[in-house]
Amino acid sequence: MKLGIVIFPSKMIQDKANGLRKRYDPHYALVPPHITLKTPFEAQDEQLESIVNELHTIASKTNPFTLHVGKVGSFAPVNNVLYFKVEKTPELTFLNEEMHSGLFTQEREYAFVPHLTIGQGLSDAEHADVLGRLRMKDFYYEQPIDRFHLLYQLENGTWTVHETFRLGKGNN
């Protein structure tokens, strides 16, 4: 099965991102707007219990924190992905590092850049045009974060929540 680990922002932030994703992200219908803590990875059914237990441990070692989302960025020239920048807090860094060690030893394809994708798969010209327009707009949102989610991919390509993990001691 294919799994992923994410943080979902508030409905207000998701609505703002979805307003752009409808036009600029072909994966719009597959998964809600999110911040990826661990990119999709393959796991066997019998590994699921160990993964869930490890995520409970990680969540209990992480305090709730404030998510800061603002400005539009891009991964160009590596790829034409547009995103809302997410401030790299110590808690986000800790979560990402924990999800790439111990039980989770998958190689990283890219360095950890917390973000909320709003567009991908754009031509170079469309990417430059949209990026230029969005960089002129002022985006800034913040919200408390007290949980993350383990997702799994269904046969039709959509993602759904398998389990939610609350941050902080005594919450799991």
Curated annotation (Swiss-Prot):
One of this protein's Pfam families, by short name?
2_5_RNA_ligase2
Instruction: Name the source's superkingdom.
Output: Bacteria
Q: What InterPro entries does the entry give?
A: 2H_phosphoesterase_YjcG-like (IPR050580), Cyclic_Pdiesterase (IPR009097), YjcG (IPR022932)
- Motif range for HXTX 2? 115-118
- Keyword check for Thylakoid, yes or no: no
Pinpoint motif HXTX 1 by residue range: 34-37
The active site annotation covers 34 (proton donor), 115 (proton acceptor)
**Any idea which GO molecular function terms this record carries?**
hydrolase activity, acting on ester bonds
Q: State which Enzyme Commission number(s) the record gives.
A: 3.1.-.-
Q: Which keywords belong to this entry?
A: Hydrolase
Signal peptide (residue range):
none
Q: Which family does it belong to?
A: Belongs to the 2H phosphoesterase superfamily. YjcG family.
Q: Kindly provide the name given to this protein in its UniProt entry.
A: Putative phosphoesterase BC_1225
Q: Which organism is this entry from? A: Bacillus cereus (strain ATCC 14579 / DSM 31 / CCUG 7414 / JCM 2152 / NBRC 15305 / NCIMB 9373 / NCTC 2599 / NRRL B-3711)
